[in-house]
Amino acid sequence: MVRRSTFCLVGFAVVLWANWAHADETDRQGEVQFLPSADEPAVPEMFRLEAATFDYRQRPVKTTATGYDVWEVTFPSPVETAHPVNNTVHCEYFRPLADGKHPAVIVLHILGGDFDLSRLFSRQLAQSGVAALFVKLPYYGPRRPEGVRVRMVSEDPRETVAGMRQAILDIRRGAAWLAAQQEVDAERLGVFGISLGGITGALAFAIEPKLTMGCFMLAGGDVAKVAWDNPELTKLRARWTNQGGSKEEFFELWKTIDPVTYADRARGKRMLMLNARHDEVIPPVCTESLWHALGEPEIVWYDAGHYTAVRFIFDGLGRVSRFFREPANNES
């Protein structure tokens, strides 16, 4: 979850990205309706969305790959912040070209904002026949304002709560956009994320009824404990206590964006967890807390730490693509 969590794959993944250039195809634009389900009143209030129609734009991206194409997609965030560049959600859509309806997955990145790992998984998913919408979280990449130190995960937990709320609402719109694509099976929508992306994904999975499949890698719950105990987040704790904040207040704030808090809403859905037995960033006890709260879904433990889990990258790619590609037993 920490900034240096690049998963050690930047060099490899950049090679996959280097050949990309904007294609000469025509841009696309249109409208999508977000229609709340009948379960919307049961959604926690801070994550609810009203019915709305929103515009989107697509721009084709050239790739040497076969079997899928790639588009840059943008649409307005349902949250308007003080920073205009953060109010547009930027995504990359990896679309399988085979005929028929395809499952589709929202892909979420790590804390450090190194997008290449997410692109690597998105490419693998698309090659496997699974549409992948890689969503860039608030204040990352093109959403980061110049000259202002504002982040989705901040030294001020109140800012972190606001950033995570916006992320979940953006993901909910992303799910609506995916469901509206003619090549997508709207009954088979999922979410996948690594580290911060896994935590955010688990929260979104519990909140958004349209998401029926969830895979969370190097993630966990009890996020206040992760933030408070991590030696690399000393500045966060120091700033909070210097402002007169208590540990109890800190934990109460983080509880509002902890996937464990809402995990009972995800029980009965299809899930897979991929975790590191010796994770020094997301302690195994925090992973187990989320696992228990979700109803003890299938979990794979790698004999690795948060960073050395790179040794299992190909196993992870295979497991993730199979999980989203193959129907559940009761669907086959």
Model-identified regions with their sequence ranges:
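Gly/Ser-rich "nucleophile elbow"/oxyanion-hole loop immediately N-terminal to the catalytic nucleophile
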Residues: 151-194
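Cap/lid segment of the alpha/beta-hydrolase catalytic domain
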Residues: 107-168, 229
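Catalytic histidine-centered segment of alpha/beta-hydrolase-like enzymes
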Residues: 304-317
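Proline/glycine-enriched tight loop/beta-turn segments at coil->beta junctions
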Residues: 83-89, 95-104, 266
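N-terminal targeting or regulatory segments adjacent to alpha/beta-hydrolase or S9 domains
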Residues: 1, 6-79, 83, 128
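Short beta-strand/loop motif that positions the catalytic acidic residue
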Residues: 266-267, 272-275, 279
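Hydrolase active-site cap/lid region
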Residues: 202-247, 301, 311
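Conserved alpha/beta-hydrolase "acid-adjacent" motif
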Residues: 280-286
